[in-house]
């Protein structure tokens, strides 16, 4: 049954976003806003190329213009545009937009209701504010990498950008939408300062109290969630892996039954280090006795918080993600469609509209920059 108003209603249709950001954090933030119905205009540098091959996804449903911000006429175009926009998002180093005459104070004087979000590695203040960096650097400075991985192998190398996405993008969206609510109540906009390092530091949420209140030094393989317990990945006979998170007693009991060793449950409930090592070793040896797909079949019948480590291709075909519609077909503007990851936000009255894949840079120049009186 179709959700009431789903075809007609978009959550953010009243918001217009001027997006100067590059790479991943800003574009992913504005992708989320666009998926939720915001009118996003991407401002790109003339001649810009899609070096990562992901812009057709990141720029989905966005309009595109090209402006050379080193030219005075381009600056004037921005100042005219900003009169009509609710939100500006930028990702330059601190001070760059100010030097261009496009900082918050300058644009605020044109549009007092403007919400201006800056995403940087270290924020607009502090001794590192001008320092370059990437995701791997931000999570390192934030302490996340310090207790990841293994003692022998060193910090874990993540396959996705934690600081960029969980740090920068998601916190930027939270900040922007909070500012929108504040503006609706007060009539005033504001500047938002998103540091990917700050935001990554908050991701220490579950481990930080052990240090800040308990004085425990956070180290690899020392705590429950980072290899210091049986909560871990286990290799199967054919070289693949299973994830085991059977922390609660009922799940732990189901795990022991699934691996054919119900007698291990009593051992698993002991809190001393030696018992913990023995239990983890027993799990490791058990998983090595069967192939990956055998374990998949076995754990289908057990609620043990044990799941296979899937490839992305396998994940995209997983019945749970397919049922949730997490892969969608988006028009590419050439009469074809391309598969992309869907918007994960689902509500009772809203269905995302995927208008088109990312456009060619400057595709909307004639429509937007050459309108009379602009």
Task: Identify the meaning behind each predicted range.
Residues 230-302, 306:
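Aromatic-enriched alpha-helical interface/lid elements that frame and gate functional surfaces
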Residues 300-324:
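Conserved PLP cofactor-binding pocket of PLP-dependent enzymes
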Residues 19, 35, 39-44, 187:
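Short beta-strand "acidic-cap" motif of Rossmann-like dinucleotide-binding folds
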Residues 32, 36, 100-242, 246:
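Active-site-adjacent "lid/gating" segments in soluble enzymes
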Residues 1-8:
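Short, Lys/Arg-enriched N-terminal segments with co-localized hydrophobic residues
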Residues 20-34, 46-57:
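Substrate-binding/gating loop at the entrance of the active-site cleft, primarily
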Residues 18, 58-110, 288:
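A structured beta-alpha segment of the ubiquitous adenosine-cofactor-binding alpha/beta core
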Residues 331-374:
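Flexible, small-/acidic-enriched active-site or ligand-binding loops
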């Amino acid at each position: 049954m179709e959700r009431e108003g789903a075809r007609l209603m978009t959550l953010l249709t009243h918001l217009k976003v001027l997006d100067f950001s590059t790479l991943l954090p800003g574009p992913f933030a504005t992708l989320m806003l666009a998926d939720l119905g915001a009118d996003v205009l991407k401002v790109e540098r003339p001649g810009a190329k899609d070096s990562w091959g992901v812009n057709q996804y990141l720029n989905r449903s966005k309009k595109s213009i090209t402006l050379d911000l080193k030219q005075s006429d381009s600056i004037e175009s921005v100042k005219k545009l900003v009169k009509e926009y609710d939100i500006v998002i930028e990702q330059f180093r601190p001070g760059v937009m100010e030097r261009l005459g496009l900082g918050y104070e300058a644009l605020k004087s044109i549009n007092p209701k403007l919400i201006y979000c800056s995403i940087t590695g270290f924020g607009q203040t502090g001794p590192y504010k001008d320092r370059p960096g990437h995701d791997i650097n931000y999570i390192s400075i934030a302490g996340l990498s310090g207790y990841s991985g293994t003692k022998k192998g060193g910090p874990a190398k993540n396959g996705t950008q934690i600081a960029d996405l969980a740090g920068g993008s998601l916190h930027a969206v939270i900040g922007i939408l909070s500012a929108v609510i504040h503006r609706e109540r007060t009539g005033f906009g504001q500047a938002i300062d998103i540091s990917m390092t700050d935001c990554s530091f908050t991701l220490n949420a579950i481990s930080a109290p052990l240090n800040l209140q308990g004085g425990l030094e956070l180290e690899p393989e020392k705590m429950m969630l980072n290899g210091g317990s049986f909560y871990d990945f286990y290799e199967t006979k054919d070289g693949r892996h299973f994830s085991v998170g059977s922390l609660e007693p009922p799940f732990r009991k189901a795990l022991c039954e699934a691996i054919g060793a119900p007698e291990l449950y009593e051992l698993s409930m002991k809190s001393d280090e030696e018992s913990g090592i023995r239990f983890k070793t027993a799990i490791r040896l058990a998983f090595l006795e069967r192939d990956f797909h055998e374990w998949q079949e076995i754990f289908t019948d057990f609620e043990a918080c044990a799941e296979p480590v899937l490839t992305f291709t396998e994940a995209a075909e997983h019945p749970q993600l397919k049922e949730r519609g997490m892969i969608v077909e988006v028009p590419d503007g050439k009469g074809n469609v391309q598969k992309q990851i869907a918007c994960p936000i689902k509500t009772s009255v809203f269905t995302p509209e995927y208008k088109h894949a990312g456009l060619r840079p400057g595709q909307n120049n004639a429509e937007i920059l050459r309108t009379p009186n602009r």
